[in-house]
Design a protein with these regions (language model features):
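Glycoside hydrolase catalytic-domain context in secreted enzymes
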Residues: 1-714, 719-735, 744
Length: 744
């Protein structure tokens, strides 16, 4: 629709119609089978709200949504279409690894490609907007939502978030009137959670955030600044407060920082109920005040709180807020719908890609392989196909390779590891399965409430893992000291995700006992770990000859595990988040700021240093770390001839000196050598994943904009000169191939 006609439409809409565009309801008000991802209050929306609500979340199914849309558009006075949204976090029907795992691929183009498949599958089922990507920097694995993040590094979050966003929104063009258009096979993306939510205190869900303005702006806002280049359709407000001011009522942050400073021009949507929760946070005394605070702050859509639906109309009529605020927010929603082409075709995209296409599964498999990180390998992997091996652990026969956020994924789309091994006729034997969780743990984690769709109309519970009397199992007593055992262990999917904070990061009790029993029979153990977060795996690593961390790998997870273990694929993942030595270290990250009383290698026993007395300072495995089945060398960096004063060109060479093809991630970090404020130890500023054949060498060139080196000074002024930096290249945050100094 032309801008002129869109403005005319807005001018003709009634107050209730405009407010309706600012209200998002859950699908349960339209269909009984809608997916709930939050709490529903006791107050039912007024009839006019369900008639005029601008968007709905948690519904899927082209035929169903087509019927709802048709009825809604016909009944609406101005025939404005609904916008169906959902949490498509790491795939719609074809499920990719969790975002934390995807970041370990260090392959943004593959992440973009997978997001395109997710968008096409979503659009074909009627979903035209997703609440993803989440680019909350997170250093605390106790926080369950770290699984949705791209990890602890601001730059990596920005790169991966931008790639995923571009995948969702597709190759945007323009209509004849010059309006930006998301293709029918695309969906509107949403950057979240703005901002600082990954820094919740103690890793506890929905908790407060206490960080300095300098850290907030330099680390936690950086991914959002970077992703603005991809023109996000939406930004979601965080539950938390920043500097004790809840985001959903923070005009300075939403209007000043997000819109004016960052240049965001899309739609701001609240998280589920966060506007109403302003009252719980005691910054307002009523839902009416909450509605006024949020609309003045610039929140365009109220997701599932009573504030807007019950109080905005009254606030306008009594003169407490001007109609211009309503017009502004309603306009932002209409522009987003126009960008999606819904005015021309309210059913746009509903006849698109079939789910689980060969290409989608191929991409999901590639991403599952590249997301997996080989943490330890004492000449154990890869296994030879003809080698007799025992396989055990609850995930050998489980289809639970998805996650709590794979809300439209189906277990019957997932092969088990046992099925993959059997299909290849490998000489393997299977050990009796232990449960993923004990009964007590299942009650604690409410695992019985963790549900996912099957191929029918109804949901089904996560299947129990139990010994099938029709299958042949070996006993632990049959394991000899020289035998090799592959154990596939990990968290239950209910143990990570939203509302899944953990104080302890150990494996479930029964699995740890199972591991110890096997370790009592043989030392030749390969441990494959599935998880939505870093775990405390120190005891596992000590008794394993190889450790492969595969996160929650998705639909093609079983195939990926088998390929990696037997060397059909070479591991190339690098950690997007540090694996702590133990939970006492967290929050932990490689970019911690420098301190006095630094611990030095030449005097490790010095008590009066910044150290733990009972554990190392360093994590068990640092950010950027990951092994391969081949070896690489990286030369020290050099400066290229400077073509422009505002750019710095740094290059090095990487060579595969091993015997098999593989990929290395060359990482470039920058260290500020002297500044008026304390700076991070180092910061990732560029990376490049290079695939090389044995003996092959390739030059890697990094171009860095000088403005990227700027930081905030004593009075929060930007410092962009008279500073010396050290650029470091290597293959992890703690591995240096060389460095070079630069001053500007």
């Amino acid at each position: 629709m032309e801008q002129k006609k869109l403005k005319q439409l807005l001018s003709e809409m009634s107050l209730r119609e405009k407010i309706g565009q600012m209200i998002q309801l859950t699908g349960i008000y339209f269909d009984d089978d809608a997916v709930l991802t939050g709490e529903v209050g006791e107050d039912q929306p007024p009839q006019w709200v369900t008639q005029y609500a601008g968007s709905v979340l948690g519904m899927i199914g082209a035929e169903k949504l087509r019927g709802i849309q048709k009825k809604y558009v016909e009944a609406h006075p101005h025939h404005i279409p609904l916008l169906f949204m959902a949490d498509v976090i790491h795939g719609c029907r074809t499920i990719a690894p969790i975002p934390l795992g995807q970041a370990c691929s260090f392959h943004p183009e593959l992440v973009r490609k997978m997001a395109r498949h997710a968008a096409a599958e979503s659009a074909s089922e009627g979903i035209r907007a997703t609440f993803s990507p989440m680019i909350d920097v997170s250093r605390d694995p106790r926080w369950g939502r770290i699984m949705e993040s791209f990890g602890e590094d601001p730059f990596l979050n920005g790169v991966m978030g931008t790639a995923m966003l571009r995948g969702y929104q597709g190759e945007e063009g323009k209509d004849p009137a010059g309006n930006k258009k998301i293709p029918e096979s695309g969906i509107a993306g949403c950057l979240k959670h703005f901002a600082g939510y990954g820094a919740v205190s103690a890793g506890r869900e929905y908790n407060d955030v206490e960080i300095s303005q300098r850290t907030f702006r330099e680390q936690y806002l950086k991914p959002f600044r970077m992703a603005m280049h991809a023109d996000p359709a939406m930004v979601m407000t965080a539950f938390n407060a920043v500097d004790r001011r809840p985001v959903s009522g923070n005009k300075e942050l939403l209007e000043g920082t997000l819109r004016e400073e960052m240049g965001f021009s899309g739609t701001v949507i609240s998280d589920w109920g966060s506007i109403g929760q302003l009252e719980e946070q005691n910054v307002v005394s009523s839902q009416k005040e909450a509605a006024e605070a949020a609309v003045r702050a610039g929140v365009d859509i109220d997701m599932m709180s009573p504030a807007y639906m019950f109080h905005l109309e009254e606030l306008v009529k009594e003169g407490s807020i001007p109609t211009s605020l309503i017009d502004k927010s309603a306009w932002n929603v209409l522009v987003m719908k126009n960008r999606l082409g819904l005015f021309e075709n309210p059913f746009a995209g509903m006849q698109g890609e079939e789910p689980l296409s060969a290409e989608a599964k191929k991409t999901a498999l590639a991403l599952a392989c590249e997301s997996s990180v080989l943490l330890k390998n004492d000449d154990m992997l890869p296994l030879k196909p003809e080698r007799k091996v025992f396989w055990g652990g609850p995930y050998v026969e489980s289809r639970e390779l998805l996650s709590r956020w794979a809300i439209f994924g189906r277990y019957d789309d997932v092969e088990t590891i046992r099925e993959v091994l059997k299909a290849r006729k490998m000489p393997v034997r299977f050990l009796p399965e232990c449960e993923i969780l004990t009964e007590e743990e299942r009650r604690l984690w409410q695992a019985e409430n963790c549900r996912i769709q099957d191929s029918g109309e109804q949901d089904k519970e996560i299947p129990e893992i139990c010994v099938n009397s029709g299958k042949q199992y070996a006993t632990l007593d049959e394991i000899e000291p020289e035998d090799t055992v592959v154990l596939v262990l990990g968290e239950h999917e209910a143990q990570s995700g939203e509302a899944a904070s953990r104080a302890f990061l150990d494996l479930p009790e029964g699995q740890q006992k199972f591991f110890d029993a096997v370790a009592g029979r043989t030392s030749h153990i390969v441990t494959v770990i599935l998880s939505g977060r870093p775990l405390d795996i120190r005891k596992i690593a000590e008794k394993s000859q190889a450790v492969l961390f595969v996160w929650r790998p998705g639909t093609m997870g079983a195939e990926a595990v088998v390929r990696l273990v037997y060397g059909e694929e070479t591991p190339s993942g690098k950690l997007s988040v540090s694996i702590p030595w133990c939970v006492g270290q967290v929050p932990v990250s490689y970019w911690d700021v420098k301190t006095g009383h630094r611990m030095v290698e030449t005097n490790p026993e010095n008590r009066f240093t910044s150290r733990y007395m009972d554990i190392p300072n360093e994590p068990l495995y640092p950010f950027g770390f990951g092994l391969s089945y081949t070896e690489f060398t990286i030369t020290p960096p050099i400066f290229e001839k400077q073509e422009r004063e505002d750019k710095i060109d740094i290059s090095c060479k990487v060579k595969n000196v091993g015997e098999v093809p593989g990929a290395e991630v060359v990482q470039c970090y920058v260290e500020t050598l002297c500044a008026p404020v304390v700076r991070p130890d180092r910061e990732l500023i560029r990376f490049r994943k290079i695939f090389l054949l044995p003996g092959e060498e390739q030059k890697v060139k990094f171009t860095v904009n000088r403005k990227e080196l700027a930081f905030y000074g004593e009075n929060m002024e930007l410092i962009d000169g008279d500073v010396q930096f050290r650029f470091i290249v290597g293959n992890s945050s703690r591995s240096e191939a060389g460095s070079i100094l630069y001053a500007f």
